[in-house]
Protein backbone atom coordinates (compact mmCIF):
# COMPACT_ATOMS: atom_id res chain seq x y z
CA UNK A 1 0.00 0.00 0.00
CA UNK A 2 1.35 3.37 -0.94
CA UNK A 3 1.81 5.95 1.75
CA UNK A 4 1.60 8.57 -0.95
CA UNK A 5 0.75 8.21 -4.60
CA UNK A 6 1.64 10.83 -7.19
CA UNK A 7 -0.13 10.79 -10.51
CA UNK A 8 0.76 12.74 -13.62
CA UNK A 9 1.45 15.99 -11.75
CA UNK A 10 5.15 16.81 -11.93
CA UNK A 11 4.78 19.48 -9.21
CA UNK A 12 3.45 16.82 -6.80
CA UNK A 13 6.36 14.56 -7.66
CA UNK A 14 8.83 17.35 -6.89
CA UNK A 15 7.16 18.04 -3.52
CA UNK A 16 7.35 14.36 -2.57
CA UNK A 17 10.96 14.03 -3.73
CA UNK A 18 11.91 17.13 -1.71
CA UNK A 19 10.25 15.63 1.39
CA UNK A 20 12.15 12.38 0.85
CA UNK A 21 15.40 14.31 0.47
CA UNK A 22 14.72 16.10 3.78
CA UNK A 23 13.98 12.75 5.45
CA UNK A 24 17.19 11.29 4.01
CA UNK A 25 19.22 14.26 5.29
CA UNK A 26 17.63 13.93 8.76
CA UNK A 27 18.52 10.25 8.81
CA UNK A 28 22.12 11.04 7.89
CA UNK A 29 22.30 13.49 10.80
CA UNK A 30 20.92 10.80 13.10
CA UNK A 31 23.37 8.22 11.77
CA UNK A 32 26.25 10.64 12.26
CA UNK A 33 25.19 11.30 15.86
CA UNK A 34 25.10 7.53 16.49
CA UNK A 35 28.44 6.95 14.77
CA UNK A 36 26.86 4.76 12.09
CA UNK A 37 27.39 4.68 8.31
CA UNK A 38 24.05 3.24 7.25
CA UNK A 39 20.62 2.22 8.48
CA UNK A 40 20.53 -1.28 9.92
CA UNK A 41 17.54 -3.53 10.48
CA UNK A 42 17.92 -3.29 14.27
CA UNK A 43 17.72 0.53 14.17
CA UNK A 44 13.94 0.34 13.73
CA UNK A 45 13.82 2.87 10.89
CA UNK A 46 11.36 1.95 8.19
CA UNK A 47 12.63 1.74 4.65
CA UNK A 48 11.20 4.18 2.13
CA UNK A 49 10.65 2.54 -1.24
CA UNK A 50 10.26 5.13 -3.98
CA UNK A 51 8.84 3.63 -7.17
CA UNK A 52 8.89 5.86 -10.23
CA UNK A 53 6.80 4.22 -12.92
CA UNK A 54 7.54 5.79 -16.28
CA UNK A 55 10.56 7.85 -15.34
CA UNK A 56 10.71 9.37 -18.81
CA UNK A 57 7.32 11.02 -18.21
CA UNK A 58 8.65 13.11 -15.30
CA UNK A 59 11.89 13.87 -17.11
CA UNK A 60 10.15 15.16 -20.23
CA UNK A 61 7.80 17.68 -18.62
CA UNK A 62 7.32 20.82 -20.70
CA UNK A 63 8.65 22.95 -17.81
CA UNK A 64 12.44 22.71 -18.21
CA UNK A 65 13.13 23.91 -14.65
CA UNK A 66 10.75 21.34 -13.17
CA UNK A 67 12.25 18.59 -15.31
CA UNK A 68 15.73 19.52 -14.14
CA UNK A 69 14.68 19.54 -10.48
CA UNK A 70 13.13 16.07 -10.77
CA UNK A 71 16.38 14.77 -12.28
CA UNK A 72 18.54 16.42 -9.59
CA UNK A 73 16.36 15.19 -6.71
CA UNK A 74 16.27 11.65 -8.08
CA UNK A 75 20.02 11.70 -8.69
CA UNK A 76 20.60 12.68 -5.04
CA UNK A 77 18.16 10.07 -3.70
CA UNK A 78 19.68 7.30 -5.83
CA UNK A 79 23.26 8.33 -4.98
CA UNK A 80 22.85 8.77 -1.22
CA UNK A 81 19.52 7.22 -0.33
CA UNK A 82 20.33 3.55 0.03
CA UNK A 83 22.50 3.94 3.12
CA UNK A 84 19.75 6.06 4.71
CA UNK A 85 17.04 3.53 3.90
CA UNK A 86 15.59 5.38 0.91
CA UNK A 87 15.50 2.99 -2.04
CA UNK A 88 14.60 4.22 -5.53
CA UNK A 89 13.21 1.93 -8.22
CA UNK A 90 12.60 3.54 -11.60
CA UNK A 91 11.09 2.12 -14.76
CA UNK A 92 10.58 3.36 -18.29
CA UNK A 93 9.14 1.72 -21.37
CA UNK A 94 11.36 3.49 -23.86
CA UNK A 95 14.87 4.14 -22.58
CA UNK A 96 16.51 7.06 -24.28
CA UNK A 97 17.95 10.52 -23.96
CA UNK A 98 15.15 11.64 -21.61
CA UNK A 99 16.95 9.85 -18.77
CA UNK A 100 20.23 11.68 -18.08
CA UNK A 101 23.33 9.49 -18.02
CA UNK A 102 24.35 11.03 -14.68
CA UNK A 103 21.17 9.59 -13.14
CA UNK A 104 21.03 6.33 -15.08
CA UNK A 105 24.60 5.37 -14.20
CA UNK A 106 23.90 5.59 -10.46
CA UNK A 107 21.47 2.67 -10.40
CA UNK A 108 23.33 -0.37 -9.00
CA UNK A 109 20.82 -2.84 -10.40
CA UNK A 110 19.51 -2.58 -13.94
CA UNK A 111 17.01 -4.84 -15.63
CA UNK A 112 16.60 -4.68 -19.39
CA UNK A 113 13.53 -6.55 -20.55
CA UNK A 114 13.01 -7.01 -24.28
CA UNK A 115 14.13 -3.88 -26.16
CA UNK A 116 13.70 -2.98 -29.81
CA UNK A 117 17.35 -2.12 -30.50
CA UNK A 118 20.83 -2.89 -29.18
CA UNK A 119 21.16 0.86 -28.47
CA UNK A 120 18.12 0.74 -26.17
CA UNK A 121 19.62 -2.26 -24.40
CA UNK A 122 22.90 -0.37 -23.93
CA UNK A 123 20.97 2.66 -22.65
CA UNK A 124 19.77 0.50 -19.76
CA UNK A 125 22.74 -1.78 -19.09
CA UNK A 126 25.53 0.58 -20.09
CA UNK A 127 27.50 1.26 -23.24
CA UNK A 128 29.11 -1.74 -24.89
CA UNK A 129 27.19 -4.61 -23.31
CA UNK A 130 25.15 -5.32 -26.46
CA UNK A 131 28.27 -5.72 -28.60
CA UNK A 132 29.69 -8.01 -25.89
CA UNK A 133 26.78 -10.41 -26.30
CA UNK A 134 24.44 -9.01 -23.65
CA UNK A 135 21.70 -7.55 -25.80
CA UNK A 136 18.10 -7.41 -24.58
CA UNK A 137 16.91 -6.78 -28.15
CA UNK A 138 17.62 -10.46 -28.86
CA UNK A 139 14.96 -11.61 -26.37
CA UNK A 140 12.09 -13.10 -28.38
CA UNK A 141 8.88 -11.10 -28.31
CA UNK A 142 6.84 -13.94 -26.83
CA UNK A 143 9.14 -14.38 -23.84
CA UNK A 144 7.35 -12.17 -21.33
CA UNK A 145 9.43 -11.33 -18.29
CA UNK A 146 12.75 -12.44 -19.81
CA UNK A 147 15.60 -9.96 -19.71
CA UNK A 148 19.13 -9.17 -18.63
CA UNK A 149 19.95 -8.15 -15.06
CA UNK A 150 23.11 -6.18 -14.34
CA UNK A 151 23.81 -6.24 -10.61
CA UNK A 152 26.46 -3.95 -9.14
CA UNK A 153 29.44 -4.45 -11.37
CA UNK A 154 28.78 -8.05 -12.37
CA UNK A 155 28.22 -9.27 -15.90
CA UNK A 156 24.58 -9.19 -16.99
CA UNK A 157 22.69 -12.42 -16.34
CA UNK A 158 19.70 -13.65 -18.32
CA UNK A 159 16.73 -13.99 -15.98
CA UNK A 160 13.00 -14.63 -16.08
CA UNK A 161 10.66 -12.69 -13.85
CA UNK A 162 7.09 -13.57 -13.01
CA UNK A 163 4.42 -12.16 -15.26
CA UNK A 164 1.26 -11.29 -13.34
CA UNK A 165 -2.11 -10.31 -14.71
CA UNK A 166 -3.89 -7.21 -13.42
CA UNK A 167 -6.25 -9.48 -11.45
CA UNK A 168 -3.31 -11.26 -9.79
CA UNK A 169 -1.67 -7.94 -8.91
CA UNK A 170 -4.96 -6.71 -7.43
CA UNK A 171 -5.26 -9.83 -5.26
CA UNK A 172 -1.69 -9.40 -3.98
CA UNK A 173 -2.28 -5.73 -3.17
CA UNK A 174 -5.51 -6.57 -1.35
CA UNK A 175 -3.87 -9.33 0.69
CA UNK A 176 -0.81 -7.21 1.54
CA UNK A 177 -3.07 -4.33 2.56
CA UNK A 178 -5.07 -6.59 4.87
CA UNK A 179 -1.90 -7.98 6.47
CA UNK A 180 -0.54 -4.47 6.98
CA UNK A 181 -3.83 -3.38 8.57
CA UNK A 182 -3.82 -6.46 10.84
CA UNK A 183 -0.25 -5.70 11.94
CA UNK A 184 -1.13 -2.06 12.62
CA UNK A 185 -4.21 -3.05 14.64
CA UNK A 186 -2.15 -5.52 16.68
CA UNK A 187 0.62 -2.97 17.30
CA UNK A 188 -1.74 -0.19 18.36
CA UNK A 189 -4.19 -2.34 20.28
CA UNK A 190 -7.00 -0.93 18.18
CA UNK A 191 -9.96 -2.97 17.10
CA UNK A 192 -11.13 -3.29 13.50
Predicted regions and their residues:
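Conserved alpha/beta core segments of nucleic-acid transaction machinery
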Residues: 152-158, 162-192
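Short polybasic amphipathic segments
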Residues: 145-151
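Flexible gly/pro/ser-rich segments immediately N-terminal to CXXCH heme-c attachment motifs
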Residues: 41
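P-loop NTPase catalytic phosphate-binding loop
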Residues: 1-37, 46-139, 162, 167-170, ...
Amino acid sequence: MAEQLVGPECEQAVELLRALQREMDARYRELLALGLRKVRREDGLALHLVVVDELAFYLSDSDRKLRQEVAELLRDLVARGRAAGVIVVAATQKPGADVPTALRDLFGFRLALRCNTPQASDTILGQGWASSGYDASTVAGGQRGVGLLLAEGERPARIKTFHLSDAQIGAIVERAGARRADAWLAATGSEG
